[in-house]
A protein has these predicted regions:
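Acidic-and-aromatic substrate-binding clefts and catalytic sites of carbohydrate-active enzymes
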Residues: 37-45, 64-74, 98-109, 136, ...
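Bacterial N-terminal signal peptides
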Residues: 5-16
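Basic/polar N-terminal segments that are highly enriched at the extreme N-terminus
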Residues: 1, 16-27, 358-359
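H/E-rich (His + Asp/Glu) clusters that bind or coordinate divalent metals
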Residues: 203, 207-217, 222, 226-359
C-alpha cells in the first residue's frame, strides 16, 4: 500500500512539475506582456485602457506614411500617451522623407535635425518604413534603397544616439505573387485593396530579393547597428531563411507584427521546425501585432478585437491545442513553448532590445 501511495505521489509531482514548465490561458492576464508594434493615433485612449486590463505595455511606432496622420501628428499622439502612461507606453520616432535635395549634405542635415527633434521626447527607436525601397526615387527616377550611401549620415546619427532602428523594409514574399497564390488571406486582402504595393503588378519595381539584399547590405555596412526587423524581417515565409540572417547578424532581432499567421501556416506543415526555431532564437523574437486604434469611435468593438487578438496569440504560443485560422485553410497545433521562452518573447526581449524603463 505504501509503495502504491509513494508511486502515486511521485507521478503526481512529475505531472505537476511538467505542467509548471508551461503557461496556460489562466496565466494570460497575470503575466506582464509587451506588444512591441502598435500604432496609437487617436486621443480617446480606448487602446491604452484595454492594454491595462490585459496587462500589456505598448510600443507605438510612428510611420512616414502618406495615408495616415502626419509625422508631427503621430509624434504628438505618442508623446501624449507616453506622458499619460509613464513606464507603460513607449514610442519609436521617424522623420519625413523629403527627396528635395536628396544626396546632398543639406538633405542629410535637414533629415537629422528633424529626427533629432522627434527623438527628443524620449523615443526608444527610429522607425524606417517601406517607402524607402518601394516608393521614394531620386531625380533620375531610380529607387532609393535602404543601403544607399546618402543615408549613411542618418544611420550613423541613429547609432550615435544608441537607438535601434525598427525597420519595415520590403514586404512579405506574397507581395510578388498573384493574389491566388498567396499563402494567407491577410496578404491577399491587403494587396487587393492596395494594388500600389502589390509588386506582382509592378515588375518594374525592385524585386523581393532586391529588398532583402539591400537590408542585409545595410547590416553588413553597420555591424554595430541594433536592428529590429518588423514583420519577421520580411522573411515571414520561411523560418530557415530568417534563421540564416539571425546567425549572420548578431545585432538583429525581429518582431512578429502581423505575421504570426505565417508562423501558424508553417506550423500546419511542420510544427517542430517552427517550435525549434522559436526556442533556438528565443532571445531575438519580440511579440507584436501591428494593431492600431484607427477604429477608435467604437470602444466595445475595438476593445474586443484587441483582446481577442492578444488572447488567440497567447494560446498559440503557450498551448498545444489544435487550432484553425481565418487566414488559411487547415489545422495546426499551438507551439506550447516553455515559460522562459514565452517570457522572453512577450516582454524580456523588448525590454532589452529597446532599453525600456518599465514601471
Amino acid at each position: 500500500m505504501k509503495i502504491s501511495i509513494i508511486f502515486f505521489t511521485i507521478a503526481s509531482l512529475s505531472i505537476a512539475g511538467c505542467q509548471s514548465n508551461f503557461y496556460t490561458e489562466k496565466d494570460y492576464q497575470p503575466v506582464l506582456k509587451i506588444d512591441s508594434h502598435v500604432h496609437l493615433n487617436r486621443d480617446k485612449k480606448f487602446f491604452e485602457d484595454q492594454a491595462i486590463k490585459d496587462n500589456f505595455l505598448l510600443i507605438t511606432l510612428n510611420v512616414d506614411h502618406s495615408d495616415s496622420l502626419s509625422v508631427k501628428q503621430q509624434l504628438d499622439c505618442a508623446i501624449e500617451a507616453k506622458q499619460k502612461y509613464p513606464g507603460k507606453i513607449f514610442y519609436g520616432a521617424t522623420f519625413y522623407f523629403d527627396t528635395a535635395g536628396w544626396g546632398t549634405n543639406g538633405w542629410s542635415k535637414k533629415a537629422i535635425a528633424h529626427l533629432n527633434s522627434n527623438i527628443s521626447g524620449g523615443a526608444v527607436s527610429v522607425k524606417l518604413w517601406k517607402n524607402i525601397g518601394m516608393t521614394e526615387r531620386d531625380k533620375n527616377g531610380k529607387f532609393i534603397m535602404i543601403d544607399d550611401p546618402a543615408l549613411k549620415p542618418v544611420i550613423d546619427f541613429i547609432i550615435s544616439k544608441n537607438l535601434p532602428i525598427t525597420g519595415h523594409l520590403g514586404e512579405p514574399r506574397n507581395c510578388w505573387l498573384p493574389l491566388s497564390e498567396m499563402t494567407v488571406s491577410s496578404d491577399s486582402s491587403y494587396f487587393a485593396a492596395n494594388p500600389q504595393y502589390h509588386m506582382f503588378l509592378h515588375p518594374e519595381y525592385p524585386s523581393y530579393e532586391d529588398q532583402i539584399i539591400a537590408r542585409d547590405h545595410l547590416l553588413e555596412l553597420h555591424p554595430d547597428l541594433k536592428f529590429i526587423g518588423c514583420h519577421l524581417g520580411s522573411l515571414e515565409w520561411n523560418v530557415d531563411e530568417l534563421a540564416k540572417r539571425l546567425d549572420k547578424f548578431p545585432n538583429m532581432a525581429v518582431d512578429m507584427a502581423a505575421r504570426i499567421c505565417h508562423l501558424q501556416y508553417q506550423s500546419s506543415k511542420d510544427r517542430k521546425r517552427v517550435r525549434d526555431f522559436c526556442i533556438k532564437y528565443q532571445d531575438r523574437l519580440l511579440y507584436g501585432t501591428d494593431l492600431s486604434d484607427n477604429d477608435a469611435n467604437d470602444r466595445d468593438r475595438l476593445s474586443k478585437w484587441i483582446h481577442e487578438t492578444w488572447l488567440d496569440d497567447w494560446k498559440y504560443f503557450t498551448s498545444g491545442d489544435k487550432m484553425t485560422s481565418d487566414k488559411f485553410k487547415g489545422k495546426f497545433e499551438g507551439l506550447q513553448l516553455p515559460k522562459n521562452v514565452v517570457k522572453k518573447i512577450y516582454s524580456e526581449n523588448a525590454i532589452r532590445w529597446y532599453k525600456l524603463n518599465v514601471k
